A protein has these predicted regions:
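C-terminal motif of bacterial Sec signal peptides marking the signal peptidase cleavage site
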Residues: 16-19
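Mature, structured domains of secreted/extracytosolic soluble proteins
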Residues: 2-7, 21-192
Length: 192
């Protein structure tokens, strides 16, 4: 797995964001100077995905997973990356013991695969996603950093992501701009 793919995975895993809202829905979470707030923590558009994620009280599990997977340097790189960042509550929905098992050194490759499944190369905004979905007749395929596909669709004004196993996640906060990409917060963990 090359460094760009690992970086993408790290961003996705660390932020674990799922489900994108349209730009109208996300506007309440952004100040006039471009600073967004995730879990009450300021996310500065001049900082990297990792530099911002470590301050989010809602993404402690993701940050720990990105660290365990060895993806910090990748997601701190120039990118750009689109990270779908699951919250701590999203990780808590997984079966008991899953996170504890995944962060063990012997499961690093599996963890990297899951995290990079949450990363799409390039900067894909909520507006880009909704346009892709509209142009695709209600669905859009996104190729992730691990090479697998996510399917994006809309439910009202909320972007939904469907993983390879049929699991769904909603984007609960979209367009959290970073110096090396964009984060969209998710309410469920996606599985390749």
């Amino acid at each position: 797995m090359n460094k760009n793919l690992i970086t993408s995975a790290l961003l996705a895993g660390s932020l674990a964001l799922g489900g994108c809202m349209t730009s109208t829905a996300m506007s309440d979470d952004m100040s006039a100077n471009g600073v967004s707030y995730v879990g009450g923590a300021a996310m500065y558009p001049t900082k990297t995905i990792v530099a911002n994620a470590v301050n989010s009280p809602d993404h402690k599990t993701l940050v720990a997973a990105v660290t365990a997977a060895g993806l910090v340097d990748t997601l701190s790189g120039t990118g750009p990356f689109t990270v779908f960042a699951p919250t701590d509550a999203a990780f808590a929905k997984l079966p008991a013991g899953t996170v504890e098992t995944l962060v063990k050194p012997e499961n690093k490759t599996t963890l990297q695969s899951i995290l990079t499944y949450h990363v799409v190369p390039g900067r894909v905004t909520a507006s880009d996603l909704t346009t892709m979905i509209r142009d695709g007749g209600g669905r859009a395929s996104l190729t992730t950093a691990n090479g697998a596909t996510l399917t994006a669709s809309m439910m009202g004004d909320v972007v939904m992501l469907t993983d390879a196993k049929g699991g769904m996640s909603h984007v609960t906060q979209a367009d959290v701009m970073q110096s090396n990409g964009v984060i969209h917060v998710l309410d469920s963990v996606l599985m390749p």
